[in-house]
């Protein structure tokens, strides 16, 4: 049974729209969430994914605000995070409401068009559902800066970015309040899914509202105001900003947006989201925001606001000095050709036309757009690590295979396709015996269902597992095909 704090009920009763009832709200909070996923179109189309999973008993109910999002029905009780297809990065387990902010940001408006965006900021990124959704919407073009304040959550963010093959991300680890200072008016679009009271999450956390207090709401709303102001300062004139939370009270939602409007006046232009998808008007506020109560779409509670920055605004701090000692240098023509030849000739992968950078004996691939940010802020991780170079030659990195061995793979690539059982063994760190012994082939790409799993060394009679130790799984779930009853 869900625990609803009486103080919360008293407060939210005053804010609930007249056409909604408190009884329906409480009943919705007590129902379990429908299971939802988003297909990762960086690796597979939604149609192909449905074709892949329907024989395994999945049914797909489209989420109206996300073209690649679906509520799914599935008979098994196993954790889908262990599913082979999830480990491959073919889908992300993501609550339906949380797919709203990226959709709102990337929907062209009368003011902006996302087609011209080169620089996008996700101010509070972890665990990465919205970051990877935006990476898919950008189709790994431009630069997506993903920031996370919590050190432990940066690791989770990085793991999800790699799993989903998002190669144009640069990860940072800062308090979001510094971006307006360090990267003033640098981004075409900014998403801030702000830390919040989490009132909308009660359907998956029955105790989320057990200790609710107005004092806590007031305190966190002050942090949210500072974050949205920083995000607004980091936004270019003419750019779009989406502010979202998974909470329901006005102080953390409309109140934060109204604060920004009070401070910056006509430079803040609210945009209506009433036409974002069929039925959006059921959750649209007078200002044009989406205030999603759980009973409206049978989802988590959520809030989404979109605005355009119509004019430049003064910066609050002097421009910081450029930071020195950037550890990467641009690869020489000889170095760049060497790494390209290795990928093409040894692996069958054509490297995209991006910046090849070198740090010591490491070769990296950066988005061209990152050049504009060198020295302006410290980055935890940029682009993808391609390979290490030693006296024995290049050694490809796992993340490069995951990010690049899909669409860039040539017919001559050295690949070995494995069965689902063999794929499970591989992901659990085990060597794969080969049914027929043959000539050793050296480094090969291990694939399942046409998608890469990682690297192995072909020894003739077996594949020696080269999966990084930190990616070895204790459990891999093979979803069985369902037999049809007569």
From Swiss-Prot:
Signal peptide: none annotated. One of its GO terms (molecular function) is rRNA (cytosine-C5-)-methyltransferase activity. PROSITE patterns: SAM_MT_RSMB_NOP. It holds the Pfam family Methyltr_RsmB-F. CDD domains: AdoMet_MTases (cd02440). It catalyses: cytidine(1407) in 16S rRNA + S-adenosyl-L-methionine = 5-methylcytidine(1407) in 16S rRNA + S-adenosyl-L-homocysteine + H(+). Disulfide bonds: none annotated. It is found in: Cytoplasm. One of its GO terms (cellular component) is cytoplasm. It comes from the Bacteria. Its EC number is 2.1.1.178. Belongs to the class I-like SAM-binding methyltransferase superfamily. RsmB/NOP family. S-adenosyl-L-methionine binds at residues 124-130, 148, 175, 193. Keywords: Cytoplasm, Methyltransferase, RNA-binding, rRNA processing, S-adenosyl-L-methionine, Transferase. This is Ribosomal RNA small subunit methyltransferase F. Its main location: cytoplasm. The active site is at residue 246. Specifically methylates the cytosine at position 1407 (m5C1407) of 16S rRNA. HAMAP family: 16SrRNA_methyltr_F. GO terms for biological process: rRNA base methylation.
């Amino acid at each position: 049974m869900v625990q609803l704090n009486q103080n919360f009920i008293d407060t939210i009763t005053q804010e609930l729209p007249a056409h909604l009832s408190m009884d329906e709200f409480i009943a919705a909070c007590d129902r379990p969430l429908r299971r939802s996923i988003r297909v990762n179109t960086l690796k597979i189309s939604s149609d192909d994914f449905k074709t892949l999973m329907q024989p395994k008993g999945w049914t797909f109910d489209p989420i109206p605000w996300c073209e690649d999002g679906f509520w799914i029905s599935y008979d098994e009780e196993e954790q889908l995070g262990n599913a082979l297809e999830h480990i491959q990065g073919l889908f992300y387990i993501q609550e339906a409401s949380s797919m709203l902010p990226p959709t709102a940001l990337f929907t062209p408006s009368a003011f902006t068009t996302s087609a011209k965006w080169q620089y996008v900021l996700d101010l509070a990124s972890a665990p990465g559902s919205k970051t990877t959704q935006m990476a898919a919407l950008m189709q790994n073009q431009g630069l997506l800066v993903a920031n996370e304040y919590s050190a432990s959550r940066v690791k989770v963010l990085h793991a999800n970015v790699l799993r989903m093959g998002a190669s144009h991300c640069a990860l940072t680890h800062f308090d979001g309040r510094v971006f307006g200072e360090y990267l003033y008016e640098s981004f075409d679009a900014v998403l801030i899914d702000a830390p919040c009271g989490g009132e909308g999450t009660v359907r998956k956390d029955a105790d989320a509202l057990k200790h609710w207090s107005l004092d806590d709401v007031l305190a966190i709303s002050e942090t949210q105001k500072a974050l949205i102001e920083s995000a607004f300062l980091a936004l270019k004139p003419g750019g779009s900003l989406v502010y979202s939370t998974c909470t329901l009270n006005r102080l953390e939602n409309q109140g934060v947006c109204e604060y920004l409007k009070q401070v910056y006046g006509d430079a803040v232009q609210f945009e209506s989201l009433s036409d974002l998808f069929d039925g959006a008007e059921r959750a649209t506020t007078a200002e044009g925001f989406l205030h999603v109560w759980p009973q409206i779409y049978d989802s988590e509670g959520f809030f989404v606001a979109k605005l355009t920055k119509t004019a430049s605004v003064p910066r609050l701090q002097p421009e910081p000095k450029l930071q020195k000692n950037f550890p990467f240098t641009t690869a020489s023509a000889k170095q760049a050709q060497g790494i390209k030849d290795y990928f093409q000739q040894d692996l069958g992968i054509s490297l995209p036309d991006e910046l090849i950078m070198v740090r010591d004996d490491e070769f990296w691939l950066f988005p061209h757009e990152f050049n504009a940010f060198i020295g302006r802020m410290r980055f935890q991780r940029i682009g993808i690590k391609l390979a290490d170079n030693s006296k024995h030659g290049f050694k490809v990195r796992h993340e490069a295979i995951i990010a690049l061995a899909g669409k860039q793979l040539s017919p001559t690539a050295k690949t070995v396709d494995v069965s689902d059982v063999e794929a499970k063994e591989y992901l659990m760190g085990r060597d794969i015996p080969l049914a027929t012994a043959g000539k050793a082939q050296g480094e090969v790409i291990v694939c399942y269902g046409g998608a890469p799993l990682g690297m192995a060394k072909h020894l003739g009679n077996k594949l020696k597992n080269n999966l990084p130790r930190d990616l070895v799984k204790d459990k891999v779930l093979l979803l069985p095909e369902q037999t049809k009853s007569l």
